[in-house]
């Protein structure tokens, strides 16, 4: 595949968010559909990454009566340079009724496949691993036919470091989600700038451990392009993911949420995403979603 086509994107000004290309603009969705999902969520005082992360696909997903639930509050103990979720060092107490509320929302939305994610909670003794399990158990109790995908942080932090991190990953893996997602987000060279508090190898370890613990669980990871990565770096990252047995992949475009976030360095074109998607398939990923508006849980239940 010729690589010249990847080099056409120019660097963009750092002073302000540049105008979005036409392929990144999405319809909002019908008000009635948006209102139904939002009411179910707001009435139960639970959170979704769709809202907290200002996902560009939330109109489409809400129209299909789906949402990705954000567990353990909306304040994150990390400060990743790309993420819209609120940051802080004094997160809220856990809502002990959250498992029931999420399970009820799953039932009301009629979800047969649900994605659970969370803020990073480095303040909790187990990083929140046990909370994922508690929510999963309640969903299964009330919705026995519903399949569950999880998207977790790296569970690094607190005491014990690597040993504790591995135990936390095992805790969630033992609960047997149908798919376990942990995002690398960017290439190795840009990890420090994009993912403060995270490490490239540490995230690869998470994905490797899952497969070691339970080879039957699908593993998944994703990258947000547009931080200044090169094609060669992206391909090398995909190879690293395959080396730890990662099954599924998402590739999407980073869009700067505000002036306080990292600026976009390049808008990758739909054609470039298609080319990367073909490379990923050739490398052996069983499921690939690659496009400017693709996000971690986009059409997740259709994989």
Swiss-Prot record:
Organism in which the protein naturally occurs: Synechocystis sp. (strain ATCC 27184 / PCC 6803 / Kazusa)
Binding site for [4Fe-4S] cluster 1: 50, 55, 61, 297
Binding site residues for [4Fe-4S] cluster 2: 76, 80, 83
Main subcellular localisation: cytoplasm
EC annotation from Swiss-Prot or TrEMBL: 2.8.1.8
Cofactor: [4Fe-4S] cluster
Radical SAM core domain mapped to chain residues: 62-286
Reaction(s) catalysed (UniProt annotation): [[Fe-S] cluster scaffold protein carrying a second [4Fe-4S](2+) cluster] + N(6)-octanoyl-L-lysyl-[protein] + 2 oxidized [2Fe-2S]-[ferredoxin] + 2 S-adenosyl-L-methionine + 4 H(+) = [[Fe-S] cluster scaffold protein] + N(6)-[(R)-dihydrolipoyl]-L-lysyl-[protein] + 4 Fe(3+) + 2 hydrogen sulfide + 2 5'-deoxyadenosine + 2 L-methionine + 2 reduced [2Fe-2S]-[ferredoxin]
Protein name, per record: Lipoyl synthase 2
Details of cofactor binding: Binds 2 [4Fe-4S] clusters per subunit. One cluster is coordinated with 3 cysteines and an exchangeable S-adenosyl-L-methionine.
Subcellular location: Cytoplasm
Annotated pathway: Protein modification; protein lipoylation via endogenous pathway; protein N(6)-(lipoyl)lysine from octanoyl-[acyl-carrier-protein]: step 2/2
Entry similarity comment: Belongs to the radical SAM superfamily. Lipoyl synthase family.
PROSITE patterns: RADICAL_SAM
One Gene Ontology term, aspect cellular component: cytoplasm
Leader sequence residues: none
Recorded superkingdom: Bacteria
Family matches, as HAMAP family: Lipoyl_synth
Main EC class the enzyme belongs to: transferase
Pfam families in UniProt: Radical_SAM (PF04055)
Cross-referenced Gene3D superfamilies: Aldolase class I
Keyword terms: 4Fe-4S, Cytoplasm, Iron, Iron-sulfur, Metal-binding, S-adenosyl-L-methionine, Transferase
Gene Ontology terms for molecular function: 4 iron, 4 sulfur cluster binding; 7,8-didemethyl-8-hydroxy-5-deazariboflavin synthase activity; lipoate synthase activity; metal ion binding
SUPFAM superfamilies: Radical SAM enzymes (SSF102114)
């Amino acid at each position: 595949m010729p690589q010249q086509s990847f080099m056409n994107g120019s660097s963009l000004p750092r002073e302000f968010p540049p105008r979005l290309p036409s392929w990144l603009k999405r319809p909002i969705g019908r008000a009635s559909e948006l209102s139904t999902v939002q009411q179910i969520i707001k009435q139960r005082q639970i959170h979704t990454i769709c809202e907290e992360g200002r996902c560009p696909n939330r109109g489409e997903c809400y129209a299909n009566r789906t949402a990705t639930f954000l567990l353990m509050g909306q304040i994150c103990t990390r400060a990743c340079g790309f993420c819209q979720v609120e940051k802080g060092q004094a997160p809220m107490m856990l809502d002990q009724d959250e498992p029931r509320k999420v399970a009820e929302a799953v039932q009301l939305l009629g979800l047969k496949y649900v994605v659970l994610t969370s803020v990073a909670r480095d303040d909790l003794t187990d990083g929140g691993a046990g909370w994922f399990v508690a929510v999963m158990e309640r969903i299964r109790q009330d919705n026995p036919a519903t399949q569950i995908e999880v998207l977790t942080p790296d569970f690094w932090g607190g005491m014990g470091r690597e040993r504790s991190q591995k135990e936390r990953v095992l805790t969630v893996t033992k609960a047997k989600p149908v798919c376990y997602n942990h995002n690398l987000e960017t290439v190795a060279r840009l990890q420090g700038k994009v993912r403060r508090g995270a490490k490239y190898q540490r995230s690869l370890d998470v994905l490797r451990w899952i497969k070691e613990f339970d080879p039957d669980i699908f593993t998944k990871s994703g990258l947000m392009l547009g931080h200044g990565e090169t094609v060669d770096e992206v391909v090398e990252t995909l190879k690293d993911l395959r080396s730890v047995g990662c099954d599924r992949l998402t590739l999407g475009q980073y869009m700067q949420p505000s002036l306080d976030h990292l600026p976009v360095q390049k808008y990758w074109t739909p054609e470039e995403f298609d080319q990367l998607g073909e490379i990923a398939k050739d490398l052996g990923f069983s499921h690939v979603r690659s496009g400017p508006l693709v996000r971690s849980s986009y059409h997740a239940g259709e994989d």
